[in-house]
């Protein structure tokens, strides 16, 4: 199994056809998706476009839906929730369809929505995702970071390295790094693995969240390694369910 990592969706070659893709947006979309599905959400439906989100949500019963969204780290006006993983409690989300749009993560999902096996990962479900990928045995898996507005993000590379490290560890003879970006991400993980929260806080997006207000609970949640067994899996374009 070849494992590639792309810092942002635009770096993934248009002609690349991986068997599997794993999208990462540690701060905070893929952490929130994992937490929401773990807490009983019926599904998370991701949108790059707010217009498309509102149109799709309007067709869903009001008592069975929630609108989640942020731009620049701040909750969107008229939405039920922002992009905080600690806000998607069982009381809030159980049984509901979550219509979600964020600055970076949902756009990354849109880029790889045609890949046969599409998963999302964060630090809390790293082990579960690694085990699922290995069970499927794709010949090539692309780990895709969301970045920040098209640029590199430290925290996504940390999580990509955590996932890549675990895949290589679990399958040392059958898996290999397909690009230097993955090798560098694994090295980054080895540097910060004893204190991933410190890395998240050091990252420019972490600093951005700190400036916006008290996000200590979000940082703790996003940095918690291997705490969730849920694997968000695309079941139809843009729709993720627990698996």
UniProtKB/Swiss-Prot annotation:
It holds the Pfam family 2-ph_phosp. One of its GO terms (molecular function) is sulfopyruvate decarboxylase activity. It catalyses: (2R)-O-phospho-3-sulfolactate + H2O = (2R)-3-sulfolactate + phosphate. InterPro entries: ComB-like (IPR005238), ComB-like_sf (IPR036702). It is an enzyme of class 3 (hydrolase). Keywords: Hydrolase, Magnesium. The keyword Secreted does not apply. Its cofactor is Mg(2+). Its EC number is 3.1.3.71. Belongs to the ComB family. This is Probable 2-phosphosulfolactate phosphatase. It comes from Synechococcus sp. (strain CC9605). The lineage of its organism: Bacteria, Bacillati, Cyanobacteriota, Cyanophyceae, Synechococcales.
